[in-house]
Amino acid sequence: MTKIAVCGAAGRMGQRIIVAAREAGCTISGALERPGHEMVGQDAGLIAGCGALGVAISDDLNAVVEGCDVLIDFTTPKVSLKNLEVCALKKKSIVIGSTGFTPEERALAVELAREIPAVLAPNMSVGVNVCFKILKDVAKTLGDDFDVEIVELHHNKKKDAPSGTAVRMGEVVAEALGRDYNKVATYHREGICGERTKEEIGMQTVRGGDIVGEHTVYFIGMGERIEISHRAMTRDMFSRGSVRAAQWVVGKAPGLYDMQDVLGLK
């Protein structure tokens, strides 16, 4: 039975991960929150609404990591890298669902994961990861004859933009077309900005209300358009995916994996 610790246990995602882990038959071995959080000391199960677990929410990262097989982390890149470093020192696995990593932060994650098996994925949804595979195939088939635009929508509390999922979609398409995403991504158009180049991949961001997450990739040709969309109705698919990744990664060889590895889509 996999022993899972949850970082950000009192948050919306942390609570859903605790519920999903219990439903999957895993043991919640630890629950972590930042020092000074008002829920420190409270039973993690009661906070998550799944009944008392006898596991108090803690602010002691080292102790929580020591007692688990794998840590699930949906926080921020800065916090995730700190957690990854501690997991590497203690030879524990980690699943990271945080978004907004810079290229430098991702490179550091790759380096730290030389010591342990780690999953880093901007989206833990099975459906989204199937979309990644579809996008690769569609982009290769259509080639340079279709313009590519990506639109993503999220709730008004989301802190990073564009979403990590949208960026990964752009990277998948760019790789399939032999382009450098960082050079062709266009995040803003305003005023007289000139004609659209053939190589660019447009990225548009919408924030409002309580939208869990929606992503649409448009392949726009002359007289026809293909739209590949994914809409998240609840966060539960992310929590279930993270637990699936946690069960998968324990015992794997050291290295940085993603959900494509977890789902066998590579």
UniProtKB/Swiss-Prot annotation:
The reaction(s) this protein catalyses: (S)-2,3,4,5-tetrahydrodipicolinate + NAD(+) + H2O = (2S,4S)-4-hydroxy-2,3,4,5-tetrahydrodipicolinate + NADH + H(+); (S)-2,3,4,5-tetrahydrodipicolinate + NADP(+) + H2O = (2S,4S)-4-hydroxy-2,3,4,5-tetrahydrodipicolinate + NADPH + H(+)
Instruction: Please tell me where NADP(+) binds in this chain.
Output: 34
Q: Which GO terms describe its biological process?
A: diaminopimelate biosynthetic process; lysine biosynthetic process via diaminopimelate
Q: Which residues form the active site?
A: 154 (proton donor/acceptor), 158 (proton donor)
What pathway annotation does it carry?
Amino-acid biosynthesis; L-lysine biosynthesis via DAP pathway; (S)-tetrahydrodipicolinate from L-aspartate: step 4/4
Q: Does the keyword Cytoplasm apply?
A: yes
Q: Where in the cell is it found?
A: Cytoplasm
Give the E.C. number(s).
Answer: 1.17.1.8
- Record keywords, A-Z: Amino-acid biosynthesis, Cytoplasm, Diaminopimelate biosynthesis, Lysine biosynthesis, NAD, NADP, Oxidoreductase
Q: Which residues bind NAD(+)?
A: 8-13, 33, 97-99, 121-124
Entry-linked HAMAP family: DapB
NCBIfam families membership:
dapB
Output this protein's name. 4-hydroxy-tetrahydrodipicolinate reductase
Identify the species of origin.
Geobacter sulfurreducens (strain ATCC 51573 / DSM 12127 / PCA)
